[in-house]
Each structure stands twice: as structure tokens, then as C-alpha cells.
């Protein structure tokens, strides 16, 4: 499974109303570190299919969501559960760091 495209228009439905925890990658086309983390985000979408929803939000085209959640630098990964932000990861970080943040959420799902 590939990451879904999150927009200002579908944010509430795809993220806030999701029955699964959601990892949202706030990114932009021109962002070098975003390109570095993109393959990791794709791997997580495949590996956690059915347990975690993974989405990507282009901040240039969806500024409303980025502003609402205080995203000031990219890449920023926000992890939502039950409609609330439960964790934040800023920057291109190694995959194990992201996994360590999402695994505990899956055990309580």
C-alpha cells in the first residue's frame, strides 16, 4: 500500500476521523530532506498496511493544515490517534526512530 494523499479538503475525513492511528508526512517538492525521508514513509505505508494509515500532505498546496498544526519546518511527521496529535517528528530521521514512536500506539489500538 502506498501513502495516501492528504489535502486540506480531506484532512478531517482521512486523519481526524480515522479508526487507525495516522502518520502524516508534511512535505514539499523542493525540500531535499523530504526526498530523503520519502522512501521510509513509503516503506512504513507498506509494512503497517491495515494497522497504520500513512499519508503525505504537500504544504505548498495545503497551507491551512500546515498552519493549523504549527508546521514550521519540513519534513515534519505528525502522528494522530483518535483525532489528536500524539507525537511529532521533525526532520529527516532514521526509520527506527519513527518505528519507535508508532509501535506503542499500535499495541493500544
Regions found by a protein language model. Name each.
Residues 2, 7, 27, 53-55:
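Conserved Rossmann-like nucleotide-binding pocket used by diverse enzymes
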Residues 3-22, 63:
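A short beta-strand-turn-helix
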Residues 19-20, 26-30, 73:
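Short pre-active-site segment immediately N-terminal to redox-active cysteine/selenocysteine motifs
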Residues 19-21, 38-57:
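Conserved helix-turn-beta segment immediately C-terminal to the redox Cys motif
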Residues 26-40:
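Conserved redox-active cysteine motifs that mediate thiol-disulfide chemistry
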Residues 59-66:
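Structural microenvironment flanking redox-active thiols in thiol-disulfide oxidoreductases
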Residues 79-109:
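Non-catalytic, surface beta->alpha helical segment in thiol-disulfide oxidoreductase systems
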Amino acid at each position: 500500500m502506498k501513502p495516501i494523499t492528504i489535502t486540506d479538503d480531506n484532512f478531517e475525513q482521512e486523519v481526524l476521523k480515522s479508526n487507525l492511528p495516522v502518520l502524516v508526512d508534511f512535505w514539499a517538492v523542493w525540500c531535499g530532506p523530504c526526498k530523503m525521508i520519502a522512501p521510509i514513509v513509503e516503506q512504513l505505508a507498506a509494512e503497517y498496511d491495515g494497522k497504520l494509515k500513512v499519508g503525505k500532505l504537500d504544504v505548498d498546496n495545503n497551507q491551512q493544515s500546515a498552519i493549523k498544526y504549527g508546521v514550521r519546518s519540513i519534513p515534519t511527521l505528525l502522528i494522530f490517534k483518535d483525532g489528536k496529535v500524539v507525537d511529532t517528528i521533525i526532520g529527516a530521521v532514521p526509520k527506527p526512530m519513527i518505528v519507535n514512536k508508532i509501535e506503542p500506539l499500535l499495541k493500544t489500538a
